[in-house]
Regions:
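Conserved active-site beta-strand-loop modules that form the wall/rim of enzyme catalytic pockets
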Residues: 29, 79, 109-112
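Helix-rich effector regions associated with P-loop NTPase G domains
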Residues: 8, 23, 91-183
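Glycine-rich, phosphate-binding/catalytic loops in enzymes
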Residues: 14-16, 84, 127-131
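Conserved P-loop NTPase mechanochemical-coupling segment
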Residues: 79-90, 179
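Glycine-rich phosphate-binding P-loop
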Residues: 64-84, 114
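Short, well-ordered alpha-helical segments in soluble proteins
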Residues: 42-53, 82-86, 94, 109, ...
Length: 183
């Protein structure tokens, strides 16, 4: 969901993981659903594994790749884009994928679609609010008004002009007033 992210912060995370030798593939599955870049990145890995198998006298195998993340992160949407058709259910809420399911992408790759994974107990209030803000946890877990206030405070802290410009708000001192102006 790179289309929803801050480019500066995203680039810092990309650098962080690339510095640790991870393969990073930022992708926008909504506005640019071209997933060829993903196959371009994983093909050398698959070839390397199968070359080792062949050198040991074994047959090459289809790569089996685990797709995991927090609920509502776009795992099933990614798989559907890679397959090129709707093969898994998707929804803009957590808990749509309920079981593990192997999806054959092509003759070289199978992906394991998984339900979202979270910590068993969310003790950190900020973590819980961040997850609720991105609809990774069910609405019933936290109060919607508390989440809205948290989101507005976060936007005012990180991007103060965005909320003012988007909703034509002049006074950003009172959160309840801002909620009223937006609503």
């Amino acid at each position: 969901k790179i289309d929803l992210c801050d480019n500066v912060k995203t680039n810092k995370w990309i650098k962080y993981y690339e510095d640790r030798d991870y393969i990073v593939v930022p992708i926008d599955l909504i506005n640019n659903p071209n997933t060829k870049i993903i196959f371009d990145k994983i093909k050398p890995l698959i070839d390397e594994i199968n070359d080792k198998r062949i050198s040991k006298g074994l047959k090459p195998r289809r790569a089996r790749i685990l797709v995991m993340g927090v609920p509502n992160a776009g795992k099933s949407t990614l798989i559907n884009r890679l397959v090129g058709k709707k093969s898994t259910n998707v929804g803009n809420r957590p808990g749509v994928t309920k079981t593990l399911e192997w999806i054959r992408i092509n003759d070289k790759v199978e992906l394991l679609d998984t339900p979202g994974i979270l910590w068993p107990k969310l003790d950190d209030e900020e973590v819980a609010h961040n997850l609720a803000s991105m609809t990774a946890i069910k609405e019933e877990v936290l109060d919607c008004e508390d989440i809205a206030i948290y989101i507005i405070n976060k936007i005012l802290s990180d991007y103060p002009d965005n909320i003012k410009d988007r909703y034509n708000i002049t006074n950003t001192g009172d959160i309840v007033d801002i909620l009223d102006q937006i609503g």
